[in-house]
């Protein structure tokens, strides 16, 4: 969701309630983003890395945390303001997408130099500051989340006059688009210039 969604929803709810309805009614809108991955959603829900609850009402935030505490250790429950919670969701996806574009850009260099991107990935992945996740060269990222969330960051940066920041994140999408186009051309080249009437098998196709 775009940053400030919770704030907008709360304003809409407040403005739609008449004075008579407001009496004795109390509500709070919280931000509670999910960090589930396709294919591992159930396990991610049962064993989350963290639970993020953003809001400005401590009682409401604690009430929601009690639900999670029935199966999640309280050390994994994080409390932030709404802005931080909503931005953390966008940033998490942006960082994952950035890793994909980064290793794919290195893959292009490996191809022209004779290096093996798998060996490079394994070597840098041993660095504990970097880690090994999301370092497999691939056709790039797709789906409905990564690109959307990055462009949301781009819009946000441009809105606040941070053009260099916007350009940085937009480059992640540009690299991804360039890499996907490069891969498609490589496939056609390997199939002698055409895919017409050719049988192509895609292994591990997923979201």
Q: Which residues are covered by each model-predicted region?
A:
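Structural/interface elements that position substrates and couple domains in central-metabolism enzymes
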Residues: 1-207
């Amino acid at each position: 969701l775009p940053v400030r969604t919770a704030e907008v929803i709360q304003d809409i709810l407040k403005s739609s309630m008449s004075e008579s309805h407001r009496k004795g009614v109390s509500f709070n809108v919280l931000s509670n983003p999910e960090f589930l991955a396709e294919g591992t959603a159930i396990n991610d829900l049962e064993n989350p890395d963290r639970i993020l609850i953003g809001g400005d009402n401590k009682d409401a935030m604690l009430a929601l945390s009690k639900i999670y505490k029935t199966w999640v250790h309280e050390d994994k429950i994080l409390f932030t303001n709404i802005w931080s919670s909503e931005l953390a969701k966008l940033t998490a996806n942006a960082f994952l997408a950035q890793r994909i574009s980064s290793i794919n850009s290195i893959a292009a260099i490996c191809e022209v130099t004779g290096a093996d991107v798998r060996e490079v990935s394994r070597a840098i992945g041993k660095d504990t500051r970097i880690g090994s996740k999301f370092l497999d060269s691939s056709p790039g990222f797709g789906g409905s989340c990564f690109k959307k969330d990055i462009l949301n960051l781009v819009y946000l940066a441009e809105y606040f006059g941070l053009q260099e920041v916007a350009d940085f994140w937009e480059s992640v999408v540009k690299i991804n688009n360039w890499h996907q186009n490069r891969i498609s051309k490589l496939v056609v080249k390997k199939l002698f210039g055409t895919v017409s009437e050719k049988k192509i098998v895609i292994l591990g196709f997923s979201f």
